[in-house]
């Protein structure tokens, strides 16, 4: 009985570890696409295994394509933004 109890406890812990690891890998492999107005400093960084940035608490971009667009209300010659389409881990 003692060995059976030890076996069951070990089996439960191993099952929880394997299930959580598989779920984590599946979550990382899911990719969502969003199109928003991001600045090149944000879009230029490649994502890593962490889903959320520790500083911004936003998803880290995996791949981004940015285009320079002039603002409608140009106040200076440098008044423009980068319109980026970013693919995120989510």
From Swiss-Prot:
It holds the Pfam family SCRL. Residues 1-27 form the signal peptide. InterPro entries: SCRL. GO terms for cellular component: extracellular region. Its main location: secreted. Disulfide bonds join 32-90, 43-66, 51-84, 64-86. It is found in: Secreted. Keywords: Antimicrobial, Disulfide bond, Fungicide, Plant defense, Secreted, Signal. The keyword NADP does not apply. GO terms for biological process: defense response to fungus; killing of cells of another organism; signal transduction. Belongs to the DEFL family. This is Putative defensin-like protein 168. It comes from Arabidopsis thaliana.
